Amino acid sequence: MGLCKCPKRKVTNLFCFEHRVNVCEHCLVANHAKCIVQSYLQWLQDSDYNPNCRLCNIPLAARETTRLICYDLFHWACLNERAAQLPRNTAPAGYQCPSCSGPIFPPTNLAGPVASALREKLATVNWARAGLGLPLIDELVSPEPEPLNTSEFSDWSSFNASGSPEQEETASASAAPAFYSQVPRPPASPSRPEQHTVIHMGNPEPLTHASAPRKVYDTRDDERAPGLHRDCDDDKYRRRPALGWLAQLLRSRAGSRKRPLTLLQRAGLLLLLGLLGFLALLALMSRLGRAAADSDPNLDPLMNPHIRVGPS
C-alpha cells in the first residue's frame, strides 16, 4: 500500500513500473495511460517489465492503447483484431485477456476510472457492444474503387495543353480538397498584372500520427533547501546505514542559515551560560572539598587521642 502523490492523495496498491511511483486509478487513466502498472507487491517480487505489446511486440507508446480491468495493457488495434476473429456467437466469457485469461468485459457492478474508460472504448465496436448489452451499430463498408478505363486516354494527341492558368487552377481545386483564401484585389492599373485567387493545397488532416513524447513524472525537486529531506524515488528502497539519521541531522544543522540574535535572546543566552557555569563551579568545589576532608588527619577518629577504640 502507498499514497498517491496527486492532489487527491489516495491510498492505493497500484505501482507504476516505469516511473516507480504509487498511482491511483485517476492518475492511471490521466497520466499513465501507456505505462506498465501492476500491484506494489508484484513490483517487490519482480521489478522487470516489458514495454512492448504482447500481441505484436511493438512498443506500447507507438500506438493507441487500452487497459483491461486486470491492468494489462495492449494496443487497441491488436486487441480488436484478435477479438474480431472469434465467432460472432461467442459468449461474453469467451473474450479473455491474452495475458492472464481474465475477462475483457468489466462487470456491471464495477465502477472506477479504468472500468469506465474500458467501457467507452469497447462501445465503439460491434463485437464488444453485444457483450455489453448495447445495440449494434451500422458498420461502414468502404466501396471498392472502380477500375479506370484507359481507352479514353489512348489518344494523347487530343490533350489540350493550351489551357489558361485560370482553368487549370479551377480544375485542380475541384479535384482535391483545399482551403481557399481570397486575396483582396487592388484597383486595376495598366502597369500591374491582375491578382488571381490563391489556393492552399494543404491537407486538413496530418498524414502521420506521431505520438507525443511521454512525460516523466519525477517527484524530485532540485531547488529545495539543502537542509530539507529529499524524498527521492531512486533512493526510497535503498538500504540505509544505521547512523544515517545522525549524519542527516548534522547536515541539516550545518546547512541552515544563521539568523542574528535579538537583545533579549542574547541576554537569555548569557544568563543560561552563567547559570551553567555557576552550577559547574559548585560541583567542582564540592568535589574538591570532599576530597580535602577525606585526607585531613584531624577529622580521622582513629587519630583523636580522646577516642579510644578497643575490643567490646
From Swiss-Prot:
Compositional bias (Basic and acidic residues): 215-233
Taxon lineage: Eukaryota, Metazoa, Chordata, Craniata, Vertebrata
GO molecular function terms noted in the UniProt entry: zinc ion binding
Name under which the protein is recorded: Zinc finger protein-like 1
Keywords: ER-Golgi transport, Golgi apparatus, Membrane, Metal-binding, Phosphoprotein, Transmembrane, Transmembrane helix, Transport, Zinc, Zinc-finger
InterPro entries per UniProt: ZFPL1 (IPR039043)
Residue ranges of the region described as Disordered: 144-233
Family statement drawn from the similarity comment of this UniProt entry: Belongs to the ZFPL1 family.
Zinc finger (B box-type): 1-43
Gene: ZFPL1
